[in-house]
Amino acid sequence: MSYKVIVPATVLPPWLRVGENWIFARHRRTEVGVVLPANTKFRVRADFSRAGFTRPVIVRLLNNNRNTEREINLNNDQWMEVEHAHESVPFVDWPVGERNIMAEVYFEIDGPHIPLPVYVFNTRPVEHFKSEYRQSSSGYCFLYLDLVCMLVPPASKNALLDVNIFELHQFYNEIINYYDDLCGLVEDPYADTVDSNLPNKAAFVKADAGGPGGAYYGPFWTAPASSNLGDYLRISPTNWMVIHELGHAYDFVFTVNTILIEIWNNSLCDRIQYKWMNKTKRQQLARVYENRRPQKEATIQALIDNNSPFDNWGFFERLIIFTWLYNPQRGLDTLRNINHSYRVHATRNSSIPYPQIWSWLTTSAYDNFWLYFNLVGVYPADFYVNEHNKVVHFNLHLRALALGQSVRYPIKYIITDFDLVSKNYDIKQYLESNFDLVIPEELRQTDLLADVRVVCVIDDPSQIVGEPFSVYDGNERVFESTVATDGNMYLVGVGPGVYTLRAPRGKNKRYKLHLAHSPREPVHPANDHMYLLVTYPYYNQTLTYTPYVNSDLAVDMAHLFGSNDRRYVATIYFNPFEQTVTVHLNNIRAGRENNTTLYFEMVISNPFNGQSQTFTILEDNPTLRQGYYKFDVVTYSSIRLNMSVAGRLLFGDTFLPEGTTTLTMFPNQVLEPNLFPDGSALNRTLARLREQAAFLDNYSQLMYIENELRDSIYLASQLVDPASDEFVKYYPDYFRDPHTYVYLFRFRGLGDFVLLDLQIVPLLNLATVRIANNHNGPHSYFDTLYFKVELRDTNGAIVFSYSRRGNEPMTPEHHKFEVYSGYTVELFMREPGNRLQLIVNKMLDTALPSTQNIFARITDTQLVVGDTSIEDNLVTSINVDCGDDDNQKIRVVETLKMIAF
């Protein structure tokens, strides 16, 4: 008997490659519609004449055991004769990665064979199908349940006949749809965007008595390792096997050498149990708690207290860290964002290594989880390789500061007597664990307040006394004051939580800041990033100021990558100023799992006493803990770096070769053999300066917040070229203010009411417009244009424009936008004179032309003002003839009186 099977292609979105197994990409196939008894002979061929496909067409003879199945590759349109010794159900795989093709496959079957009962969801009554299957001599049947296709084996026939197929359909489709949503996948029939899902996808489920373990997710199907489907027909929120194996379809690259194999997919499983279960069931039935939450929390507490390396934690201990990571309001957006980032990366350049997983999660979150990660013993790497294959700085803490991220931390470490059952402070939001992560805003309802003293330890109190400080929860300022005359900060009426402290950093001296609880009460997670933990009961804090003289940007470093996928392993800092070498270890696996072969070794030798220090990284390092390893050195110490492979240790801009490279610590730099101190260190410092300046340009909010990077830029610029003003705009306020001009144009109307303020700060590339509320308009006596503000870019395009007739109502508005050198400002005022004022650094400029039209051009640091249009070649002139009949002069408005902007 003849059969013809036509199968479409599986179209891949741009982020998915042929041969990858994610989201069931190779699971689609079409049944021939028969069951072949053992030893059945048949012929098969594919029609290549019209299809246009470039890969073999695959026919599979499936049953319930991989050891008795067969795969047939059709490479041309010639007939192939086949005889198979085992009962089987023939299928044709959908060609993967092709577009706009249909594969046609022809079968000629000799001898008897059995029709395969097939059910397509919602196309006929279920009972009609079950009746057909019940009466059929076939032990097999095939189900199309939208997002899952299921080959039911003979051993599961009775179980399938007893199953509610509508509920089975709902069970599988809800799981896959939810996992798609968690990953941010969007249905798209054209599959041509970075977030496109796989069109017409479906998981393929079968039995496999020869399969590994209890069940598995494979490239071509998911199956229990049994001759029957077992739990794959059990509809229950506790069916961990099914939700676990389906979750593997979404592992992507997140489990590659991250110690998260069987963790990442289970974090999705936990989320769907979270969705399905009510509060009581969540505690009793969820796999992460199993009615033993207090005991599991105690285990986590012991691991933290003992500083156990996170990579050595147990399976479910690591999993529950993700439970608490994803529980907060926007926690799941972290998961969606990191998946989107992966797809962008895969679409753009799959050869570039992915970021270290903890850095990746940190930069994908809407809240700041860095302190939480440190608590459990993982350290996000602060470097990554960008799309141009260049190692760049994440600046994780500054990025969080610029984005106004709130810091989440376990509630039990904030309200130290909190207990979910016995003392929960009647908190109204849903919490399921004493380790749930909260922010200060969520704890206001407790009405717990503290007066906290921050003791400042500094060599020169005059650098900070009387200076303002503030405390922030994300973007919200919750407290502000000034440093008291005794050199301390006093916080009054502050609720519990982790805040960001914006502390003064000195005036003409710069400092590094370190924040911690009092030494006798080491509760606070000490840090250099101004994360201020206010506990209940509260403790006082200690803020230690250490003079900052030599910029960190002048410190050379090396970047260590993994052997196979170039994953980020460690940063090595060679600090000649502090005479230290510091290793920041971010990944304990540099190569193959469980392999103890030497991967990297550093030996530091003291030339004066012959002593040496050694730091070793094997391919796998289960006993190492992520974090910092610091070694003291002396001038002329030799630092021997031994690499087992080439091209995985980047020093400066050069990948070091396999074998040994010896560096020497000089007073101001580290050099390779046969080299002598030269200007190369300054060149590398200048390159880092420009890179970090670009970072501040990208996160311009940091230009208005005192921070260590601005200190570092100032100190490094003084080292590279003290006379240069290239980096002035990035300096700390104390050093930047003398170069900062703030121009305020103020428009007034009838009764001298303020209509509009236009403020321009050229050095910071910032313009701000504040428009007042005036229902009657600027001046009700005029029905014509009364005033106008317009800014244009260097191409003449309008950046901002606002105008009103005299009797045209005004409503309040506030605009903030960037302006650059060469931008022009055009102002019109119907009644010039006192109705249009220019205030420079809080001083009224009395020489503003008293004309209706005022023109100005922005330069790098100042504003050129006149009453006629300013040509490009006049931009830098201080006194220039405009060429008009009145010989009007254009001046640079300047003053010696500065303000802290």
UniProtKB/Swiss-Prot annotation:
Q: Identify the keywords attached in UniProt to this record, alphabetized.
A: Glycoprotein, Late protein
Task: Give the gene that encodes this protein.
Answer: VEF
Q: Which InterPro entries match?
A: Mucin-bd, Peptidase_M60_dom
Report the domain of life of the source organism.
Viruses
Where the record annotates domain Peptidase M60, the positions are 27-330
Give the Pfam families listed for this entry.
Mucin_bdg, Peptidase_M60
* Record-given protein name: Viral-enhancing factor
List the carbohydrate attachment sites: 265, 278, 339, 349, 540, 594-595, 642, 683, 698
Keyword Glycoprotein set for record: yes
- Tell me, in a sentence or two, what this protein's role is: Involved in disruption of the peritrophic membrane and fusion of nucleocapsids with midgut cells.
